Each structure stands twice: as C-alpha cells, then as structure tokens.
C-alpha cells in the first residue's frame, strides 16, 4: 500500500468511524450532474469540521512532547481555533488563541457569537492582535511569553496546516477511496483551499489512490499566484514525510473569494441557501459557501475535465452562520 508510512506517526483517534460520503439527489437534479458530498462537517467534536483530522496528529505530537498548552492563531471566527480549543479541553490542556479581526467589523454578532462564543465555553485564553501579518513569528513570540509564565506550550500553525497536520487529509483520501471503491467513479473533487493543509493532504493521497480524479481547490483568501506555492510546498513536505513522490498538478480556481477572506459574497451565500433548501445541509459564508459557488459555476462554465460525478469535501464551518447574521 503506497501510504503505509502513515502508521508511523502518533495519532489520537478523535473521529472514530469514517464520516459519511453521501449522494445529493435533489442537488444533483438541480445541477444536472451527479454530486456527492464528504461530510467532514459532522466530525464528532465542537460542532464538527475538517480541522479535527489534523488535530489527531498535532495533539498526539503535543502530548508526546509533554506540552500542557496548545497555542494557535486565526480569525475571530476561526473554525480551526474553535476545534483546537475543544481538543485542548478534552485533553485537559490549556489553550491560548491569538486572534485577528480580518474584516475590520464592529458588528457585535461577529465579535461575540458563533465560533467566538464557543471559545469562551471551552475556557480559551484570548490574545488579540491588529493583524496576523507574520503568524509563525507571532505564534513563536506568544509561546515564549507563555513559557515564561511556567507553561509548556506547543504551537499549532494557522489552520493546523503543516506537514504533520496535513497527514489528516492523506488519511481522509484513504477513507474516500475506500468509500468510493465499487460504488462510484469520482471524476472531480472540489475543496476549499485556504491555509492549504487540507488541499495538500488530499493532493498527495488522491494522487496515489484515485489518480484518475482531478482535485480542484477553490481559493478562499488568495489569488492562484499566491496560493499555488503554499499548496505545492506543503504537498512536497507531506510527500517527504511519507517517503512518496508527489507530482500531481495542483489545480486552483480563484474566481470566487472576492471581495476577500471572511467577507461573504452573493454567489457564496446563494450556494449556502441552495444546499440548505435542497438537502438540509449547512455550508458557511467563508469557506464552503464559496467553494460550492465554484462547483456550481464550474459546471455551468464546463470547467471540469468531463461530466462525471463530482465529490464536494464539506469541511464544516456552520457555526459562523450565526456570527454573520443578519447578512445571511
């Protein structure tokens, strides 16, 4: 098996059983194409989401190093920070979160509801900053301060997106391949591409397990020119960890994230409403709504390699719906 080296890495099994891979009959009828969805929005902790796959590896490494504190960073409405805080609570660890307000809003709902509300429930220590201009350096500086207070910190990068965390999505590719085997030949896979770990992990895994399927990353914060090196660098770092080759082309669409990260747009919100009304599934305004807008438009514009079945990776994020009200 090409991915056998995955078992060398310590991992905490937070998720347990595979998340569902479902056919969307009403949505498929609406679009005139077979659409399937991988339900990583229903992972078991803290209202679900994709970051739990990364945290299985990252938290295991933190415990191996004897850490008593998890430190990470993100936007006020970060899904990753929310799930990191929940994992810390479950493991009896302290959690410190460095947060920014990327959209510069003073709206009370954004500042206090959704993911931010959940951080308080998980007893997270919040440190605000003007902007995460150099998050790796800012996290290291925060870790130094926390260590000086007598804690043993473990730094988790934005999105959990380093080579170790991204192994969670190599593992996900294994799960997807097993669920599809003998059931459906997926032509294209669509995923939101942000901090790049989910995209890069899938790229490595699917290249070896489902090489005939194209993987499309719909960017949520950057142009192709800026996002491509992030995904490629992680793709190669993951492959090195697993002693594999990674030569699959990284495909990105950057037409759907404007006006910027964390700012809802009409196409994304229409996608959120459409899936809710046709399938009872909740997307979010920041990641999955925009990625689904890309899928919908990609079908309309014939951007996919053929007319075969499409798999959408649902990375979660529904708690943010409450923070963005009344814009939803």
Curated annotation (Swiss-Prot):
What are the protein's UniProt keywords? Answer: Lyase, Pyridoxal phosphate
Cofactor or coenzyme needed: pyridoxal 5'-phosphate
For this protein, the Enzyme Commission number is 4.4.1.15
Q: Which domain of life is it from?
A: Bacteria
State the function annotated in the UniProt record.
Catalyzes the alpha,beta-elimination reaction of D-cysteine and of several D-cysteine derivatives. It could be a defense mechanism against D-cysteine.
Q: Which PANTHER family match?
A: 1-AMINOCYCLOPROPANE-1-CARBOXYLATE DEAMINASE-RELATED
Q: What is this organism's lineage?
A: Bacteria, Pseudomonadati, Pseudomonadota, Gammaproteobacteria, Enterobacterales
Which residues are reported to carry the modification N6-(pyridoxal phosphate)lysine? 51
From the UniProt record, list the reaction(s) this protein catalyses: D-cysteine + H2O = hydrogen sulfide + pyruvate + NH4(+) + H(+)
In terms of NCBIfam families, this protein maps to: ACC_deam_rel, PRK03910.1-1, PRK03910.1-3, PRK03910.1-5
Q: Which GO terms describe its biological process?
A: D-amino acid metabolic process
Protein name in the entry: D-cysteine desulfhydrase
Which molecular function terms from Gene Ontology are attached? D-cysteine desulfhydrase activity
Family affiliation:
Belongs to the ACC deaminase/D-cysteine desulfhydrase family.
Q: How does it assemble?
A: Homodimer.
């Amino acid at each position: 098996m090409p991915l056998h080296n995955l078992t060398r890495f310590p991992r905490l099994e937070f998720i347990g059983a595979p998340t569902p891979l479902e056919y969307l009959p009403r949505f498929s009828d609406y679009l005139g194409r077979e659409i399937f969805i991988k339900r990583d929005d229903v992972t078991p902790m803290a209202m679900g989401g994709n970051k739990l796959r990364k945290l299985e590896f990252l938290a295991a490494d933190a415990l191996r190093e004897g850490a008593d504190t998890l430190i990470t960073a993100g936007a006020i409405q970060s899904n990753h920070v929310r799930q990191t805080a929940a994992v810390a609570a479950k493991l009896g660890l302290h959690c410190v979160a460095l947060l920014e307000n990327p959209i510069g809003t003073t709206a009370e709902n954004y500042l206090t509801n959704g993911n931010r509300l959940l951080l308080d429930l998980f007893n997270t220590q919040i440190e605000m900053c003007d902007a995460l201009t150099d998050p790796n350096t800012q996290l290291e500086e925060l870790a130094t301060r926390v260590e000086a207070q007598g804690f043993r910190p473990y730094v988790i990068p934005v999105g959990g997106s380093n080579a170790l965390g991204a192994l969670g999505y190599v593992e996900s590719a294994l799960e997807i391949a097993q669920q599809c085997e003998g059931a459906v030949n997926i032509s294209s896979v669509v995923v939101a591409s942000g901090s790049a770990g989910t995209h890069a992990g899938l790229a490595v895994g699917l290249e070896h397990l489902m090489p005939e399927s194209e993987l499309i990353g719909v960017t949520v914060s950057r142009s192709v020119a800026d996002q491509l090196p992030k995904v490629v660098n992680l793709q190669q770092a993951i492959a090195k960890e697993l002693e594999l080759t990674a030569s699959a082309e990284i495909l990105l669409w950057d037409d759907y994230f404007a006006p910027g990260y964390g700012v809802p747009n009409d196409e994304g919100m229409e996608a959120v409403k459409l899936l809710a009304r046709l399938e009872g599934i909740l997307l979010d305004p920041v990641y999955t709504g925009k990625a689904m807008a890309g899928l919908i438009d990609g079908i309309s514009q014939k951007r996919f390699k053929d007319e075969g079945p499409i798999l959408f990776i649902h990375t979660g994020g529904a708690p943010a719906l409450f923070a963005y009200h009344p814009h939803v």
